[in-house]
Regions:
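Long, contiguous binding/interaction regions
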Residues: 1-115
Length: 115
């Protein structure tokens, strides 16, 4: 899956569909889920002290089927390889477990100047 992500983004760059390079510094967004807002805020504060940018929480709105799950988003500008991203994901799954969160919900990537 991560190998495919890198391969697809490299192809998009070659095709001129994106201007940024997944092999360079990127804005990596990491997501966590839980039903307890305070627990997510505390986890976000811990991650902020570790160098992540606390982007915010996304709470359910009327259009969401799941009215209980809240999402935490933290970002970090850094360069990853397939192996380093796999290691980061493993680290964040452990972090979610240690914080008592429902789950680490994965990541997204974009250019450094992305919102």
């Amino acid at each position: 899956m991560i190998e495919e992500l890198f391969a697809n983004l490299r192809q998009l760059k070659r095709d001129g569909q994106v201007a940024w390079d997944v092999d360079g510094a990127c804005r990596w967004s990491f997501f966590f889920i839980d039903e307890d807002r305070d627990r997510l805020v505390r986890a976000g504060e811990v991650l902020a002290r570790a160098g992540y940018e606390f982007v915010g929480l996304r709470e359910p709105d009327g259009a969401d089927d799941d009215q209980a799950t809240i999402f935490l988003r933290v970002d970090r500008v850094e360069r990853h390889t397939v192996d380093s991203l796999m290691a980061r994901n493993a680290e964040l799954y452990k972090f979610a477990d240690a914080q008592g969160l429902t789950d680490y919900d994965g990541m997204d990537v974009g250019p450094v100047d992305a919102p």
